[in-house]
């Protein structure tokens, strides 16, 4: 079963790099404590490592969390320039992750 992407309200990309050893609870703590956001509000949160070749995506749906991981063997993930806040918000229809 995959997530229903129609239910994703917003997509947030963390501005700071993240320790990729963090799992659901650690990433949820970043969302609530550092970003002051509700991790249960049907938003997708994206975290990347310092070399930008790995991402983790955290999403809460119905009664549980999804945690997705992607590792590029070649290349890096590219994101638009970040604003002053700790996260960059992008809307689902315009969301693009480039390899």
Where are these regions (language model features)?
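Polybasic/polar functional segments that serve as interface/processing modules
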Residues: 1-99
């Amino acid at each position: 079963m995959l997530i229903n992407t129609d239910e994703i309200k917003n997509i947030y990309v963390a501005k700071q790099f993240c320790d990729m050893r963090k799992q659901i609870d650690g990433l949820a703590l970043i969302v609530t404590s550092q970003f002051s956001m509700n991790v249960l509000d049907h938003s997708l949160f994206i975290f990347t490592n310092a070399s930008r070749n790995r991402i983790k995506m955290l999403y809460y749906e119905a009664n549980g969390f999804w945690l997705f991981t992607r590792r590029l063997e070649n290349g890096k993930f590219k994101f638009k320039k970040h604003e002053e806040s700790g996260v960059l918000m992008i809307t689902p229809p315009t969301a693009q992750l480039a390899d």
